[in-house]
Amino acid sequence: MNNRVHQGHLARKRFGQNFLNDQFVIDSIVSAINPQKGQAMVEIGPGLAALTEPVGERLDQLTVIELDRDLAARLQTHPFLGPKLTIYQQDAMTFNFGELAEKMGQPLRVFGNLPYNISTPLMFHLFSYTDAIADMHFMLQKEVVNRLVAGPNSKAYGRLSVMAQYYCNVIPVLEVPPSAFTPPPKVDSAVVRLVPHATMPYPVKDVRVLSRITTEAFNQRRKTIRNSLGNLFSVEVLTGMGIDPAMRAENISVAQYCQMANYLAENAPLQES
């Protein structure tokens, strides 16, 4: 038996498809999402509707974004979901969530079992729309969830941790074994809740500067910041901000990265491209 076939659909490797089929896990995720009628619920990658059906049962209207044309067609003809669905057959990586929130007249509640092969770049795409998003619930590779929630001085702490926590409050919800999927992935999974900050705890003047600093620091994470960020900050400037130049990228808190970004935005602003 081909374990890549589920409910008559062949899982496409290039789309990173692993279909959720464990009812206890599904119920736990829907309970965590807690969808309510009248909310602007948006699912990324509904697949074979494992989450779409129980969420859709509670709603009058649900928006889904599905790249796979066969799966989008199945949803369109779904016996009870079909009339409730607004289906966008396109890539979530290029989707304009801001326009959708404007169209729906309220911030979006986004959820999904994300394809693991695009989960990190998709998170960064979504972060650029946090003004238009109320909250997000995602099934991700457990290692990615660990990176999202990691604090300084840990191996998992990296650029994704800093940027996620700059934009959102990040809360792990539950862990999910490979056996909950068809075909089973080779990794453990986990569900995470991300709630964009109503008020930024560490406001930055130019988020592009924060992105640049974290990229440069974590691309050379074994180097001290005296070396990895030496082209941006002198030892005197770092010391003046109370940041030890002998620290490495993983030792610096989100607040300190934001402090560094604001210094740079004021003293060496990026030119508009």
UniProtKB/Swiss-Prot annotation:
SMART domains named in the record: rADc
InterPro entries in alphabetical order: KsgA/Erm (IPR001737), rRNA_Ade_diMease-like_C (IPR023165), rRNA_Ade_Mease_Trfase_CS (IPR020596), rRNA_Ade_methylase_Trfase_N (IPR020598), rRNA_adenine_dimethylase (IPR011530), SAM-dependent_MTases_sf (IPR029063)
Record field: catalytic activity: adenosine(1518)/adenosine(1519) in 16S rRNA + 4 S-adenosyl-L-methionine = N(6)-dimethyladenosine(1518)/N(6)-dimethyladenosine(1519) in 16S rRNA + 4 S-adenosyl-L-homocysteine + 4 H(+)
Gene Ontology MF annotations: 16S rRNA (adenine(1518)-N(6)/adenine(1519)-N(6))-dimethyltransferase activity; RNA binding
Keyword RNA-binding: yes
Gene Ontology CC, one term: cytosol
PROSITE patterns for the chain: RRNA_A_DIMETH (PS01131), SAM_RNA_A_N6_MT (PS51689)
Keywords: Cytoplasm, Methyltransferase, RNA-binding, rRNA processing, S-adenosyl-L-methionine, Transferase
Record: residues binding S-adenosyl-L-methionine: 18, 20, 45, 66, 91, 113
Main location: cytoplasm
Stretch forming the signal peptide: none
EC number per UniProt: 2.1.1.182
Subcellular location: Cytoplasm
Class of the enzyme per the UniProt entry, highest EC level: transferase
Membership in a protein family: Belongs to the class I-like SAM-binding methyltransferase superfamily. rRNA adenine N(6)-methyltransferase family. RsmA subfamily.
Protein function: Specifically dimethylates two adjacent adenosines (A1518 and A1519) in the loop of a conserved hairpin near the 3'-end of 16S rRNA in the 30S particle. May play a critical role in biogenesis of 30S subunits.
Name by which UniProt lists this protein: Ribosomal RNA small subunit methyltransferase A
